Amino acid sequence: MTKYTFKPKNFKAFTVDGLDARMEALNERVRPQLNHLGDYFAQYLETATGEIFYPHVAKHARRSVNPPKDTWVAFATNNRGYKMQPHFQIGLFENQLFVMYGVMHEAKDKAQQVQAFVDQFDALRNLPSDYSVSLDHMSQEKTYIHNMTDEDLFKAFRRVKEVKKGEFFVARTLSPNSEHLKNDKAFLSFLEETFEQLLKFYK
């Protein structure tokens, strides 16, 4: 029995129709792992940074009609919420597991927060080839950093500063059949390796 990782059947929770039925499927097939990952990586981040991190598992409480197309656990140093500050996420869509760190459009002082990526531009450029950028946390679409020009990246930074909906996340993704998801040991190793890279941009 696995505690942390996700199998293809877990991703299938997103194929269940209807809000109530999908929420029930997510609560049964996905939320237990997110809760365990929340506890594990809150401690991991505290050890790595010396700061206390709080896990926030998505509840989707505001939804009344449309079922969620993704779900996640987020990590931030604020125990009341995470959207207002740069934060880490582990989550999944039907066809993608994602690990991200960045700035959401709701964040306070977005222009100042995205500056961490500008200041660490060389580190961003030198990330392994499977790292990507997400400009919208609600979309599965992400662009590999090695396929982006410097101008593409600086345009993305400017968008965060100038556009209300502007966001910037550095991400790493897996398909549901990835070898990194075959067992807890492989998955935790993948996640720790990813967090180690993402922490380069944490101030």
Curated annotation (Swiss-Prot):
Annotated SUPFAM superfamilies: YktB/PF0168-like
Species per Swiss-Prot/TrEMBL record: Staphylococcus saprophyticus subsp. saprophyticus (strain ATCC 15305 / DSM 20229 / NCIMB 8711 / NCTC 7292 / S-41)
Lineage: Bacteria, Bacillati, Bacillota, Bacilli, Bacillales
Organism superkingdom: Bacteria
Family: Belongs to the UPF0637 family.
InterPro entries listed in its UniProt record: UPF0637 (IPR009403), UPF0637_domain_sf (IPR053707)
Protein name as annotated: UPF0637 protein SSP1683
Pfam families, A to Z: DUF1054 (PF06335)
